[in-house]
Amino acid sequence: MKTEYTISQIAEKLHITTNKIRFYEKKGLLTPMRESQNRYRKFGEEDIFRLETILLYRSLGLSIEAIQNILQCNKKENYLTHMQNQWMAVNNEIHRLSEIRKSLETVLDKVYEESEEQELEKDFLKIIEQSNLLCQVKNEWKDQWDFDGWARAYDEDVKRDAGVLKIYENYETVLQMVFEEVENFQRKDGKILEIGVGTGNLAGKFLQNKDHIIGIDQSRQMLAVAKEKYPKLHVRLGEFLKIPYENQTFDVIVSTYAFHHLNEEEKRVAIAEMMRVLKKDGRIILGDLMFQNKAEEHLNLLAKEVEQYGKRVVYKRIDRFNYVVAIQ
């Protein structure tokens, strides 16, 4: 005989209120049985399992609408879509709160140190304005190149290198040099982050060498292709301006054919973000395009920005457009 429970028993069992259960029922997430005479709710074991699932998803911050969609379609791709959405929402909020905390820290120092009270408001406004500008740079970046649409054709397009400039002529050489730079530097147990992992061509080299690498990319379709090619590769949604990891997490950061997509202000933010998640004795290796009339400008920008972190820039020019840059 099947065990049945009242709403009060379920609430006590799961340490929640009866109102919460009624709310989920009202939203269509639960459909308990009703007694024919008094219309009291009756819950079976399946209802308990479903409610526990709902509570678990809510603990991850998923919306009622997202949970409803997952319960209606429990396919892998649907799970992935909603979990990636929540991953990005959480990461965005962490970065937003982090900037607020930095602003408050600076404001508190000003309050303690400023002797002229009338100057405080001016200082506050300047601090908040600087913080807002940084958040604006981070939040306004958009994929203007449709990498999702390019993902399935990317590898073939790189091989064909159909453009007049032949910018991918030494693509494999650049990837191999970045790989060798890392292998010559890092310990075998070191953690590597690749930003703009794309279809996994560089990450695959590290995987074959049994290195611990995580790849992030803002393109879901690029990540999907990378995961198909390298099932053991750990991939996450993420980008230069809001890296989804804690301070001093990685021994090495690598990136190829991605950094040049940022403008000058975005590059500064990206360098600060990379330095934030890089361990103090860590290293950054970039393989990227630098057009001749801009190469010196880009290298000078890198050198100036990393100098404040006690780092220096060493680079090798591969051809007219391609450079491998080490920040060490």
Residue spans for each PLM region:
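Basic helix-turn-helix/winged-helix DNA-binding cores
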Residues: 1-64
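Short catalytic micro-motifs in class I SAM-dependent methyltransferases
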Residues: 257-258
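Class I (Rossmann-like) S-adenosyl-L-methionine-dependent methyltransferase catalytic domain
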Residues: 115-185, 190, 199-232, 237-242, ...
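Short, charged amphipathic alpha-helical surface segments
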Residues: 71-131
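A short glycine-rich, Lys/Arg-flanked "PGG" loop and its adjoining helix->strand segment in the class I
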Residues: 268-280
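Conserved active-site tyrosine of GNAT-family acetyltransferases
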Residues: 24, 43, 147, 154, ...
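A conserved beta-strand element that flanks and buttresses the S-adenosyl-L-methionine
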Residues: 254
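Class I SAM-dependent methyltransferase core
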Residues: 194
